UniProtKB/Swiss-Prot annotation:
Family named by the database record: Belongs to the INSIG family.
GO terms under cellular component: endoplasmic reticulum; SREBP-SCAP-Insig complex
Gene name for this UniProt entry: insig1
Protein name per the record: Insulin-induced gene 1 protein
Keyword field contains Transmembrane: yes
Function: Oxysterol-binding protein that mediates feedback control of cholesterol synthesis by controlling both endoplasmic reticulum to Golgi transport of scap and degradation of hmgcr. Acts as a negative regulator of cholesterol biosynthesis by mediating the retention of the SCAP-SREBP complex in the endoplasmic reticulum, thereby blocking the processing of sterol regulatory element-binding proteins (SREBPs). Binds oxysterol, including 25-hydroxycholesterol, regulating interaction with scap and retention of the SCAP-SREBP complex in the endoplasmic reticulum.
Transmembrane segments: 59-81, 101-118, 134-156, 160-178, 184-205, 220-237
One MF term in the entry's GO annotations: oxysterol binding
Membrane topology according to the record: Multi-pass membrane protein
Organism from which the protein derives: Danio rerio
Comment text on domains: The KxHxx motif mediates association with the coatomer complex.
Amino acid sequence: MPRLEEHCWSCSCSTSVKTKDLSSAGWIVCKTGEMMSIITSVLSHAYGSLHSLQSANLIRRGLVLFIVGVVLALVLNLLQIQRNVTLFPEEVLDTLFSSAWWIPLCCGTAAAVVGLLYPCLDHHLGEPHKFKREWASVMRCIAVFVGINHASAKLDFANNVQLSLTLAALSLGLWWTFDRSRSGFGLGLTTALLATLIAQLLVYNGIYQYTSPDFLYVRSWLPCIFFSGGVTVGNIGRQLAMGSTEKIHND
């Protein structure tokens, strides 16, 4: 009998210990689930905030690039008109195109697209920047671009071929000085080809025209202007992207 009582007591003790272990394990599992839920909620909220911040920065950068493109278009087109490089036909003056309001808008939109594409290509290609980016370098790039456009309107060469070769060398020098990236060269070249094609179509349809065209309907140096403009806008877009990234990290 004593042995039976001892056996029953040991069984009851072991059962109570197992029950306590199971309850402890259940409590740990419950608390772990609560902690995982809290962590998931915090991470989801952080991701949502980061995504919203990135979207806001993208819109802000696009607006800045659009404004820059509009301002550059107004200034550079004024230089061309003063030298009678570009003209508007008389029949167009009676239409909505007479004020050429669409030129700055188109240039602003193109600047926003190109400026946003440059940092995206850098990120996807994994191509590091050759230089330490700063706004002083970007401003010098803008000054050189305006100088190239001014030279296209002011300089007088014996023929347009010499002018085109000179501007091509200056445009490549601008890319080499302020960029030197394959993505920058490729996107600048693509911008030059597409913009020149669009200009050809506009002139062909009588909306726009150039005096003394020597490259189908436009001037032969026009692709050089578009190339240097694409590189310039790309540098602005990269600088804006770097500033936005640093701000996000600080936040």
